[in-house]
Design a protein with these regions (language model features):
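A short, Lys/Arg-rich alpha-helix, primarily the initiator
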Residues: 1-25
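DNA major-groove recognition helix of helix-turn-helix/homeodomain DNA-binding modules
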Residues: 55, 59-76
Length: 96
């Protein structure tokens, strides 16, 4: 059975949100991968690149890990609409 795809044919729906968060933190893809690895998560630069270009599926554990690392809601990562708590931490987040 083929896996579902996003409306634009991508393999995930968090690509734009992950890139926006990473950029707001002033991190390169390599920097983010290193920080996630230090937190005990199995991410490398290529994984970050593939997620941000919608060329990789993201599982629930990875979604939770990214949400926890950045301190944002699942709904922001999934829907691109920041909650008031997300905006307190990242005031420049715009709905994507």
């Amino acid at each position: 059975m083929e896996k579902l795809r996003s409306n634009n044919g991508g393999k995930n729906i968090i690509a734009d949100q992950l890139k926006a968060l990473r950029n707001q933190c002033g991190l390169s893809q390599r920097d983010l991968a290193g920080k996630l690895q230090l937190a005990g998560l199995n991410f490398d630069k290529n994984i970050i690149t593939r997620i941000e270009t919608s060329n990789r599926f993201v599982n629930d554990f990875e979604l939770k890990s990214l949400s926890n690392y950045f301190g944002v809601s699942y709904s922001y990562l999934l829907d691109g609409i920041p909650t008031s708590e997300d905006l307190e931490k990242y005031p420049d987040l715009l709905p994507l």
